[in-house]
């Protein structure tokens, strides 16, 4: 029987806090962007909602001690828009795969508010690749069951490998997880 460990609960609680802060700050940034479109002569800057969420967590003491003094590191997309990112640092044997599937579920539900999308799952070596692929394809395994819940059904999850064909229609209608 699978049992989530206390420190995994703490890691996921921190992720939940970050996603909540992102939602709040993104809502505000979206409202500013809408107003700026209606009033272009005001030249309003659009807030970086990701940095604001990070700073909120820092001010609340919710960042890990190892990250609290490190400056915010901005990530942007090709259109110069802020992009949130998450790194979960967990020791060997610490349940990183479980945290990853639980994290995907939370990100899909709490932040993206979608049951469909694309996840690129990168593993460090062939042994972990083989093991992870086996678990993600096994509908009886807790990892796969967490993904099934995130996608609102087992028939809505596609576990893919790099040689598999990726189609936009699949990404729009399924949770596509490509393992590399």
Protein language model features and the residues they cover:
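RecA-like P-loop NTPase motor core of helicase/translocase proteins
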Residues: 1-180
